[in-house]
From Swiss-Prot:
GO cellular component labels: small ribosomal subunit
GO BP annotations, alphabetical order: translation
Name of encoding gene: rpsE
Gene3D superfamilies for the chain: 3.30.160.20, 3.30.230.10
Taxonomic classification: Bacteria, Bacillati, Bacillota, Bacilli, Bacillales
Name this polypeptide is given: Small ribosomal subunit protein uS5
Keyword Zinc appears in the UniProt entry: no
Length: 166
């Protein structure tokens, strides 16, 4: 998979979660912050990243940098996805179903951020199992990675799109 150059895209950032993490040492607790950020151009490109630092803004900056390195392309048909798919990560699972125009994004918290920034405006989703933000984001990305356009599937099978769709 080729890397996507973040400088050529107009990316929008969304902070999904900020977590205060404590390391207990002899003198007390050492506090740090971890941030989970999703970036996307609302036109088929989306990425996520995590960052850790002593201060919240610095953690967010690191997360945005990381997210720009992990961009991926999402196949979009009209305003939705080409087919139903199930994404897994750890104990988290998400079902993504295409929806008719005008339905909107029906998704919970972290998954909604990913889908909206990917540019999908009509989709149904259901998250099952772990609902930790990082697990939901990674499961959503797993689902989006599995998506294929009809043209790609037809090419792999050596058929035309018409033959494939019957």
């Amino acid at each position: 998979m080729r890397r996507i150059d973040p400088n050529k895209l107009e990316l929008e950032e969304r902070v999904v979660a900020i977590n205060r993490v404590a390391k207990v040492v002899k003198g007390g607790r050492r506090l740090r912050f971890s941030a989970l950020v999703v970036v996307g151009d609302k036109n088929g490109h989306v990425g996520f990243g995590t960052g850790k630092a002593q201060e919240v803004p610095e953690a967010i900056r690191k997360a945005i940098e990381d997210a720009k390195k992990n961009l991926m392309e999402v196949p979009i048909v009209g305003t939705t996805i080409p087919h139903e798919v199930i994404g897994h990560f750890g104990a988290g699972e998400i079902i993504l179903k295409p929806a008719s125009e005008g339905t909107g994004v029906i998704a919970g918290g972290p998954a909604r951020a990913v889908l909206e920034l990917a540019g999908i405006s009509d989709i149904l989703s259901k998250s099952i199992g772990s609902n930790t933000p990082i697990n939901m984001v990674r499961a959503t990305f797993d689902g989006l990675k599995q998506l294929k356009r009809a043209e790609d599937v037809a090419k792999l099978r050596g058929k035309t799109v018409e033959e494939l769709l019957g």
